[in-house]
Amino acid sequence: MDNTIGPRVDPSIRAFDFTALFEECFLDILPWSLFLLMLLVRLKFLLNRPKIIRVDRLCLIKEALWTLYAVVKLAQLILWASIAAFTTAGTVPAAALAFVGCMGGSVLSYFEHCRSRRPSSLLGILTLLILLCDVTRVRTMWLMDQPRAISILTTAALPINILLLVFESLTKTAVANEKEASRSKEEIVGILNRSVFWWLNSLFILGRKHVLHMGNLPRVDSKVLTSYAAPKVYERWESKPQSLMLQSLQAYPMTLLRGGLCRLFTALFVTSQPLLLKRTIRWFSEPSTPVSDAEGYGLIGAYLVVYGGRAVFTALAQHQNYRLITMIRASLVSLIYDRTLTLDLVEAKESAALTLMSTDVERIGQGLQFVHEIWATPAEFGVAIFLLQREVALGSLAPVIIIIVAIVGTVLLSMKIDPHQKEWIGAIERRIGSTTDMLRNMRGVKMSGFEDALTSILQAMRVEEVNISRATKLLFIGCQVFSTATATISPVLGFTIYVLMQRAQGKPGLASSSAFTSLSLFSILSSSVYIFLTSVPAIFSGISCFARVENYLVSENITGPTDAEGQDSEASSISAEKISIIAPKIAPSDYLLVIRDGSVRWKGQEKAVLSQINLCIEQGSFCVISGSVGSGKSSLLYAILGEASLKADTFHISTTSIAYCQQSPWLPDISVKECVLNGRDWDEDLYKRVIHACALSEDLAQLSAGDHTKVGYEGGTLSGGQRQRVALARALYSRRRLLLLDDTFSALDPKTEKSVSGNLFSSSGLLRELGTTVICTTGKPGNSNKYADYTLDLNKEGEAQLRNTQKDMQDDEIEASTYSREQNGPKKQEEDANHESNQSPETSQEHELAQESVPTFSSMIFYLRSTGMGFFALSFSLSLVYSFWQNFPTIWVNLWTQHDAKHPYGDLAKYIGVYILCAVLALVTHTVVTWFVNMACNGIDGAAVRAGPTRDTPENSGTASITGRGYVVFTNKHRAPMSYFESVDIGTITNHFSQDMEKVDLEIPLTGVQALFAFTSALVQLVMLSIGTKWMAITFPFIIAILAIIQRQYLKTSRQLRLLDLEAKSPLYSHFTETLSGLATIRAFGTHKQCQSINTERLDCSQGPFYLLYCAQRWLTLVLNLVIGAMAILMMGVTIKLRGSTGAGYIGLAFVNLTTFSQSIQSLLTWWTMMEASIGAVHRVQQFEKETPQEDVLGQVTSPPHSWPKAGLIELKELSASYLSSVSPVLRNVTFTVQPGQKVGICGRTGSGKTSLILCLQRMIKINSGSILIDGLNTSHVPAKTLRERLICIPQDALIFNGTVRLNLDPQSSFTDKQLQDNLRRVELWDLISSKGGLDATMQDGLLSHGQLQLFCLSRVLQKKSPIVILDEVSSSADEESQRLISKIIREDFKDRTVISIAHRLQQIADFDIILVFSQGQLVEQGSPEDLLGRDVSLFQDLFSQQDK
């Protein structure tokens, strides 16, 4: 009998065993043959790789073990050959193959050790597989009647195999180079280690013992980082830019394939469970015999294989899936950023990039979670229906029909998701764009008193977004109802059809084995269908987001200047004849820039901004472009840069080496030194010369950390003049051939402007020495104009005239300070003589972030209180009711089969009727809970947002949903002091408004309700497990204790990873936001690669916790599934002992509930892990509500009378102030009084404290000592928001945000359209704006120039009533005509009001009543203009006289 293929040997020979020939063929020959084939392929690959690991003790031990193993196999071969009587046809070939395989294993082990960074996967699988096979072979050997020597040798091979398995799985440490030593643990451990996620244990130990932060977080697999993942998609996209989704999936074929194979094995194990259950019930019903008892123990092994295999392969399939998600995330974010760098400036204002890289990429990831479910689950329910047909015959048609209806319904609903989701994401996009605008301009928002107005606008946008989201959520709910219907209705209809058919045919009714096997199949069927129908809308949503990203990537790039025929004009294409038309006396080679008959227009505008432009610029010359406000000066520079459309008969530029200073300086949030270096190599001498030339030495000396001081977001820690000069220093340090300056001196005081102009443009100036060609725009006569070689005059009609400028290059006495190469820079730079790097030290905040309390149970309580504990109690109760009705039918079926066995078809109507009632009640309660949680939260959300800003007080706690409450908390950030916004990364706040709101708004209701269903179902199923096998109830306390230990181990680390995941995204968002605001500068300097490098670095930083959190979740999936497997094995063991003492129905009941319990746990894990990040977002809401500082301290402020201020009297007494308590004062002992109606001008060098004084008046910086009184009331006792609303203030930088002209003019909706039009007419802008759409026109780049924007902001306050008007350089970008208009408005419209105006153009304040002169934070002069100008020594006189020169 042993010489047959069997597979089972005759029980009379050996009980429950395979034949010897079967074992030799399938447990020896097959695995060794496959190994030898794969050995050849692997060796060919390894021979082409370099040696990266040294031969060490581990290598020698493995070689020794393989040699010993080969010796044992050789001895077996010799013995078998010598005793032919005990062999079969396969004995000698099997032994020979094993010997050859051991020799091959020895060779492969050596090469794998030396040329692969991780232990051999092939040898790891081989040793494990051979070990399992040999265990079976050893048992057979000892049962067979043969020489003991063979059995002894076979047994002796087992410990050697075990040692090989251990040593072949050990991590290698003798690395040959530093690169390999820096690999992550996942990259260097073996396949068995990776399969059970053993490598993650060190992370959990670290998370339990220490606080996780970015500094101690383990490295992640390099293949999920941007440097590896992004090029895979980028190369495919560049070669074939279509179907981004397919390109992304095809870029990682092995990851996709490995995930698919693991999912296939999972499906095999899942569909094996009903067959195993059927065999168990039949075995339980059979009489006890030695053979059947042996089979019982064999069933324990079967449960070990099925449940253990399912646990491992489920975790591996999900792990490969989430690796795919992580890699696609890296590639998409990188692609979006790269595309953003080529984005048109007008499109950049729409903030699509932020939404795409956050919301859309997140939803793509959510859809990709189900990428293998879309094919695997249909396969599962196909197999389940086939097996079901064998049990209930035509009863299997019921689930088929229901599945078809559910799938068709779900697909139809999912197809409708796309347009609704696009509308929803569009609303999110608009909200995030407006929110980002508000945050970027928070200083201007506060100074203008628009905090509440803009917050109300944001809240209205939030309400609109919530309302738009309802349609999408309803469609998701509909899909869930279809999937639930399969689970609730299929079993009852299937059993009803089967029983009625059986009765009609006179056959036996419902048997216990068929009933519970069918229930198990129905459970698998419903679970598979549920996952499939859940995955369909998620995948459709992901496809929709892929399409949005794809549309963004293929949108039109910026177009450079073109000639009249539309062909790109290269430097080599210009002809001497064309140049000679404009400048016949100069050789063409002398020109750096030539434009002939050029016209400039912005995208989306038909009318040209400039026309008939003729311009010839010699190399090394200095050209000034002058013109009135709105004449197109900046547009011409943008056209030269390629940002605006330039068409010309001739366009020639002989260099791409361009530096650019835009009118509103763009400075990333890094140190001053890093801004100046801009990624270039350190040159100490040049750096000192540049700092001195830009007159920054004195400014840097006053900063707390010198040139290592961070400039803040958009240069918020610097004054306007300092920002312009730092940007200028960056341009000078770049040493470019062409320098474009867009009104760069507008914020400089006359003395500083004169000094900088001389240092740069005089005959011995730095730019003259470097031979740099300069084109500078200006709207006013200035010190730089007299150095110009050419002047291009632009008029309001967009026409230009080029003329030579008569220059007097004689330097006067003041110009003695002109740039000198030997002049020393600031002392701070002297300390850096040995500086070798352009990177300054930065203080990491990661550890501080990580030390924040992580989300705990209190976060969930916070969420539940926000939605209302009654709301949660009702939801939980209804969910428990659903779970009962969903699971009670298993008990009912057991009662039915017992009754049917005694009374065939007795009380059939009762059993069918109750079953139908249970199904209907389950479906109804499920639908109610799903709708209630999703839509009721949505309704509460809108109400909470409309309720407006609130703090958490006993009166309102628990009255609003976390979604609405969270947004209110975030919008309340405008109540924080300005120092908060200057110290907090704007990306962090943007992250709150995008990621956190996305998670709290969408994910918690959708995933939370599913997790709730799974949790209550698991509770009910545990009870039913104890009903099936009462002895199992004894183990429940131990199981619960084990689960509690696992939960504690997991949550301690996962909470911190969730927080790090959210925090690590903030710098990424900040960089996106900074890039969008500085596109023109980035492209002008050509620092694309530097910006891409920063993006890659920050993206990789966020990939770490993002990926590790997914890995930790897979570890939890594996461990809990192994616990369920242990429960199944334990239950089978209990079943063996209970055999004959209980009915088979109860055993079936127990195992069915174990199957459903495992599905509930799997579902709970799936939905809970999806909800984890949302819980982290809830925690952040909780933290920010608690920790965000407030400007007003309760009890220290009181609301002033409604009529305050009435007169406009301002008194400052011994005032000292600083931006932060740790920083030296910016104002020192300032004392003065302004009488009602007086006009006060403030002047002084840039950085002298002028703007700081205005900020003090508005309580925007910290007052250290002294007081400010307005109409006798101390402003420190007035709520800051109220104070700013009662004053009129126009900040230095024009405050413009996304929206219409009407919204920008009147955010508070206080005036009629006619009043707004009259205001625009007063500043002479109405004709221009009305021609572009009037009040409904959208504010965008190109609509108004910088000077016109200042006039626009002035028109905004003309109708506002307040006795005090504060103006911060409102004419800095205005031409002379506009300055006269502004002066007229101040004299006429504000004649009875107190006016405080900062000005660098001193003519603007020459007719004011009082002049205040500041220097280094102190008031050094005050008096009337006449008095100060008449003094022998006067700083004001000095400034005034330098401006006139």
UniProtKB/Swiss-Prot annotation:
Residues 259-541, 974-1173 form the ABC transmembrane type-1 domain. The chain crosses the membrane at residues 21-41, 77-97, 119-138, 150-170, 187-207, 255-277, 297-317, 368-388, 392-412, 481-501, 520-540, 868-888, 912-932, 1004-1024, 1026-1046, 1116-1136, 1147-1167. Signal peptide: none annotated. Residues 803-850 are annotated as: Disordered. Pfam families: ABC_membrane, ABC_tran. CDD domains: ABC_6TM_ABCC_D2 (cd18580), ABCC_MRP_domain2 (cd03244). GO terms for molecular function: ABC-type transporter activity; ATP binding; ATP hydrolysis activity. ATP binds at residues 627-634, 1244-1251. Keywords: ATP-binding, Cell membrane, Membrane, Nucleotide-binding, Transmembrane, Transmembrane helix, Transport. It is a multi-pass membrane protein. SMART domains: AAA. Residues 595-821, 1210-1441 form the ABC transporter domain. Residues 824-835 have a biased composition (Basic and acidic residues). PROSITE patterns: ABC_TM1F (PS50929), ABC_TRANSPORTER_1 (PS00211), ABC_TRANSPORTER_2 (PS50893). It comes from the Eukaryota. One of its GO terms (cellular component) is plasma membrane. InterPro entries: AAA+_ATPase, ABC1_TM_dom, ABC1_TM_sf, ABC_transporter-like_ATP-bd, ABC_transporter-like_CS, ABC_transporter_C-like, ABCC_6TM_D2, P-loop_NTPase. It is found in: Cell membrane. Belongs to the ABC transporter superfamily. ABCC family. PANTHER family: ABC TRANSPORTER ATNG, ATP-BINDING CASSETTE SUB-FAMILY C. ABC-type transporter; part of the gene cluster that mediates the biosynthesis of gramillins A and B, bicyclic lipopeptides that induce cell death in maize leaves but not in wheat leaves. May be involved in the secretion of gramillins. This is ABC-type transporter FGSG_00046. It comes from Gibberella zeae (strain ATCC MYA-4620 / CBS 123657 / FGSC 9075 / NRRL 31084 / PH-1) (Wheat head blight fungus). The lineage of its organism: Eukaryota, Fungi, Dikarya, Ascomycota, Pezizomycotina.
